[in-house]
A protein has these predicted regions:
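Gly/Ser-rich catalytic serine loop of serine hydrolases
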Residues: 177-180
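Short amphipathic alpha-helical segment within the helicase RecA-like ATPase core
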Residues: 1-157, 162, 170, 175
Length: 180
């Protein structure tokens, strides 16, 4: 525990482990051989706190978040010839096994829905645009859960955005895949 801290020791321990776990990420899918000075990997971290059972339970939830962070980092680390709208949609479809409802719209469906602005972004691409809608209704509904208002997150998953290329500087253009 840190004297004067406004966070419980168990939460502090779990957050320390979570930070170390996030820091351990490494995208080396395309690495052909390890460099001479191989990046050190954290093999173990022991955090002592007075309520270790609570810290372990909190960290278990954080580990699931880290899995999602690593999945996202893997996606944005892929080059544009590997991750494009159809492959991103396929990756999203794989989340069905976790209870996520996934709907993928193609260009025809988007046109019928009047999504001209979105279609305009992708019209210069050789690949078809996709709209991926993911819905997760959570754990089985309790009375308390049913009384809560739904929460919606809206984001974009543009796999490579060179939009406005005439006004963007060329330096860093390769990083436009991080626009997700």
């Amino acid at each position: 525990a840190v004297e004067g801290a406004k966070i419980a020791a168990a939460d502090m321990g779990a957050n320390l482990g979570f930070g170390a776990l996030l820091r351990s990420y490494r995208f080396d899918k395309y690495r052909t051989k390890e460099p001479k000075e191989k990046k050190p990997l954290l093999k173990a971290l022991k955090v002592l706190c007075p309520t270790s059972a609570k810290a372990k339970a909190t960290f278990a939830d954080m580990e699931k978040v880290a899995d999602g962070v690593f999945f996202t980092r893997d996606l944005v680390s892929e080059p544009a010839n590997v991750l494009y709208p159809a492959t991103l949609a396929k990756e999203a479809q794989a989340l069905k096994k976790l209870g996520v409802k996934v709907t993928v719209l193609g260009e025809k469906e988007m046109a019928k829905l009047g999504m001209g602005a979105l279609l305009g972004v992708g019209q210069g691409s050789a690949r078809e645009s996709k709209m991926v809608i993911m819905e997760w209704t959570g754990v089985p509904k309790s009375k308390a859960a049913k009384a809560q208002q739904p929460v919606a997150f809206v984001g974009k998953g543009v796999t490579f955005d060179t939009g406005g290329i005439s006004i963007k500087p060329s330096a860093g253009m390769e990083d436009m895949k991080w626009d997700m």
